[in-house]
Amino acid sequence: RAQGKYIFFFDSDDTLAPDTVKSIIDYFDTVYDEVDLVTYRITQYFKNAPPVYHFRYRTLTHTGVYDLDDPKNRFITQTNVNICVKNDKNNGIFFDESPGFRHEDEKYCCDILRRKMKIGFCQKGEYRYNRNNENSIVSTVFSPYYIFETSMAFYEELFNSFGGRVPPYFQGIVFNDLRWKLKEDKLLPYHYSPEEFARANRRI
């Protein structure tokens, strides 16, 4: 079990910029009572291609605390492990380890953020996401054959958990997932029968 004040997460084939840990900790200390999670820039690196940045950085333009109840922040959509969280042993929030779930990072962030509906962002530091691994989860099992039903069930459960109006931020979470899967042709379950495919489209 982690013993420090904060927890960082890190995938084995990714790297951090040298100043990342100190920069994030120094900033988190200044907003400790306001937020439970601080995010920082994630950059996708592909072989022989320019770095790719998520559209959330059109909103996250400066170091500070962002109100997730404000509709203009609905596309921050924190879904990856480029985060630092408090080492709170009593909050009861853990990664969902259900076999084949594939949304564990996203759900973990949602569970933490919905408590205060605020997120901290530090401009310093960088999570360097290696997209060159052809054997990664995203490259191998992030296809509708494996995750369409799981993804839909997760988002239906997420929306239902609000018992009515869904905050724009969480609507943005779903929009983000649909957007990138459509772009990479990983959304629609083409392997379904025509009847099942039509039903799946209505469900989306």
What is each of the regions a protein language model found here?
Residues 3-4, 78-93:
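Conserved nucleotide-sugar donor-binding
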Residues 7:
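Short aromatic/hydrophobic "clamp" motif used to bind/position activated sugar donors
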Residues 10-12, 96:
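Active-site acidic Asp-centered loop
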Residues 15, 19-55:
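Conserved donor NDP-sugar-binding/catalytic core segment of glycosyltransferases
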Residues 62-85:
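A recurrent flexible, glycine/aromatic-enriched loop bordering the glycosyltransferase active site
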Residues 99-101, 121-153, 184-198:
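Nucleotide-sugar-dependent glycosyltransferase catalytic core
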Residues 101-108:
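Acidic donor-binding loop at a coil-to-helix junction in glycosyltransferase catalytic cores
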Residues 164-168, 173-204:
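Terminal low-complexity segments of carbohydrate-biosynthetic enzymes
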